[in-house]
Amino acid sequence: MKKYDVAAMGELLIDFTQNGYSDQGNPIFEANPGGAPCNVLAMLQKLGKNTVFLGKVGQDGFGYQLEKALKEMGIGTEGLCFDPTVHTTLAIVQNKDDGDRDFWFYRNPGADIMLCEDEIREELISDAKILHFGSLSLTDEPVRSATKKAVAAAEKAGLWISFDPNLRKPLWKSEALAKEQISYGFKHCQILKISDDELLWFTEETDFDRAVKRLQQEYGIALILLSMGKNGSAAYCGNQKVMVPAFVNKNTIETTGAGAVSYTHLRAHETDQYL
């Protein structure tokens, strides 16, 4: 019997999210726990699943805040490391009028980048059913090598692997490097969550169905989940396609983590039904 339904690795950071304006008209930013991998784990915990995180934060106030948040959610922190010299990664999230966001990062370096191969606890991975990761842990060394060690351990232990490109172009040295490393994620996953913008950017297609077919043929991905914002989402498995309309809120305020939420519900169902 596996101890964990899902193990995730990657960035754990502080999202400074705009939350109103001061009396002087300046934007006010709130320090929220963030990072796509742990957004997924947080939702899985709420759905009654057991999860564990592998990653690195700074040995600072923000790092301890993040550790506390994980423990309060019930996410396993056995794989969480602390860097004594590099601070916790920070993201500035500024909302647009349509509810979408702009991101700026303080990550040159940030603690999440500093996770090393010898800090990967393979026994945590082998004790899970699914390993989830994204491309932010492929942008730089040493975390890139650590991520690939975790993926190799998952494959050796027979886990399903899920991948979310979660493309943040400013964090990559070049788009060519981004495509190279995201292609690595495609090659090693059975479950892919990808946004409409990411799909068309990577494939250079203009049609979603044609772009998905290219990924299926080139990488053999079993299940592709496509998020399209206000246009809903779609799931592709072989020749089957299911479309779901969006739940549109005309007064959208904040969309950070929305993709992780929809992704999580389906993966919780997969854990129950297929693994």
Segments and roles (model prediction):
Residues 1-76, 252:
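Glycine-rich phosphate/adenosyl-contacting loop at the front of the ribokinase-like
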Residues 259:
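Short basic (Lys/Arg) and small-residue
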Residues 160-161:
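Short beta-strand/loop segments at the ligand-binding rim of alpha/beta enzyme cores
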Residues 50-133:
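Conserved N-terminal subdomain of the carbohydrate kinase-like
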Residues 264-271:
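Conserved small/polar residues in nucleotide/adenosyl-binding loops
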Residues 157, 171-243:
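Conserved phosphate/ATP/ADP-binding segment of small-molecule kinases
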Residues 12, 136, 165:
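Active-site metal-binding loops of divalent metal-dependent hydrolases
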Residues 45, 71, 155-156, 186:
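Anion (oxyanion) recognition and catalysis
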